[in-house]
Amino acid sequence: MRKTDAHILVFDSGIGGLGVADCIRRMLPAATLGYVADTAGFPYGAMSDEALVTRVLTVLEQAIARLRPDMVVIACNTASTLALSALRSRHDLPFIGCVPPLKWAASVSATRQIGLLATPATVDRPYLTALMQEHGQGCTLHAHGARHLAGYAEAVFRGETVLVEAVRAELGILGMIPDIDAVALGCTHYGRLLPWLRQAMPRPVAWLDPAEAVARQAARIAITAAATAAPDSLPRAAPCWAQTVFTTGAVPDEATRQAWAAEGFPEWQPLEIASA
């Protein structure tokens, strides 16, 4: 794999990974990107841990067998937390995951009061305690699980209207504690809602989107792999799935297809899942 021809597959339950894909595209403009959206499984937060791991393993095993990428970016906090170890043990290729950027929040907070805006499934998982113990730097964490924000992000992607008042209602305690000065986004979908979140919050805070950090890690691995490639190896042609989004759910309508195209994925193909 060379920096100029890395074949990278981005995975999420929906459109949450598009921010990560955009950052990768800027950092590695010659890389080939494809996208797998497990739309039939959205939202992942509604699944049990066991069901989610089974789902992610099944979808990605079939996608990897079909597409043969050099690297897979798991642009989903929940899937990263639960399934990353199993994926790495089953496949001989790099997997990049994402976790809530609590270390970043702790590093920028002046009040030592930080927020986490995530899905209820993420907020309820015990790994947050371990993250805070390792990276919290003496901060107090105020976590809120928003039930509808991921769906609102999907609606914005489709061109539907989402009201600031609806987003404000999803902020929970984060909008009530005046000392919070940094909020980590614990769901990649939420980056699409940043304009709404800034308007909805009753005071200015730093909104921390992990998309760029995830992309930087992917770029580092791609560049390292390129540096160790044989010096006389030739660049490869882009695979047939370049700029293609694969979805597991219903066939997207024309407006949704156009929205994917506007995000750099003008081609669409179904990803048939035998069982999950």
From Swiss-Prot:
InterPro entries: Asp/Glu/hydantoin_racemase (IPR015942), Asp/Glu_race (IPR001920), Asp/Glu_racemase_AS_1 (IPR018187), Glu_race (IPR004391)
Active site feature: 76 (proton donor/acceptor), 187 (proton donor/acceptor)
Molecular function GO labels: glutamate racemase activity
GO biological process: cell wall organization; peptidoglycan biosynthetic process; regulation of cell shape
Enzyme class: isomerase
Alphabetically ordered keywords of this record: Cell shape, Cell wall biogenesis/degradation, Isomerase, Peptidoglycan synthesis
Reaction equation(s) it catalyzes: L-glutamate = D-glutamate
EC number annotated for this UniProt entry: 5.1.1.3
Pathway: Cell wall biogenesis; peptidoglycan biosynthesis
Binding site for substrate: 12-13, 44-45, 77-78, 188-189
Function: Provides the (R)-glutamate required for cell wall biosynthesis.
PANTHER family: GLUTAMATE RACEMASE (PTHR21198:SF2)
Family: Belongs to the aspartate/glutamate racemases family.
The name this protein goes by in its record: Glutamate racemase
Originating organism: Granulibacter bethesdensis (strain ATCC BAA-1260 / CGDNIH1)
Gene that produces this protein: murI
